[in-house]
Design a protein with these regions (language model features):
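N-terminal auxiliary interaction/assembly segments of multi-subunit proteins
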Residues: 1-70
Length: 70
């Protein structure tokens, strides 16, 4: 039968200390680097497959694929 693959679209990764994590509260804003939306990692089952760009598609968001890694 069909094989399921879990896709993830990663916008940004940031390391924080446990103290910083514990200090975060609801509705707190976390800043992203400039142009983070231009480099979205496309992962399948935890493996990096390629990258793309976050784009507006009418009333929703999507990822435009720029490159598949071999």
């Amino acid at each position: 039968g069909p094989v399921d693959v879990k896709l993830e679209f990663v916008l940004y990764r940031k390391n924080v200390t446990l103290a910083e994590l514990e200090a975060m509260g609801q509705q707190q804003l976390l800043s992203l680097p400039t142009n983070a939306e231009l480099n979205v990692e496309i992962m399948a089952n935890g493996v990096l497959l390629g990258n793309g760009e976050l784009v507006q598609m009418n009333d929703t968001l999507g990822v435009e694929i720029h490159e598949w890694l071999s």
